[in-house]
């Protein structure tokens, strides 16, 4: 799946946050829903303007961002007490 066909970010919509093309549904909102335990089907029912492919594109976008970033938000992540 090529996320670049479905994920856009423009400064005049949602303060430039990445979102599903032709919607105001942000990648952040989708990640929050998934983290809260919503299924893809739950999301599609709640937000009928998006598809499962849109959600997959959002996941692919986030995965690529994390692969390319050279840092981790250590302050937000838990601490591994077993690390030597």
Report residues per predicted region:
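Amphipathic, hydrophobic secondary-structure cores in small proteins
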Residues: 21-61
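Structural/interface elements that position substrates and couple domains in central-metabolism enzymes
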Residues: 41, 45-46, 75, 80-84
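Residue-identity detector for threonine
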Residues: 10-13, 23, 51, 82
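C-terminal structural segments of small proteins and small subunits
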Residues: 52-76, 83
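Basic, low-complexity segments
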Residues: 1-15
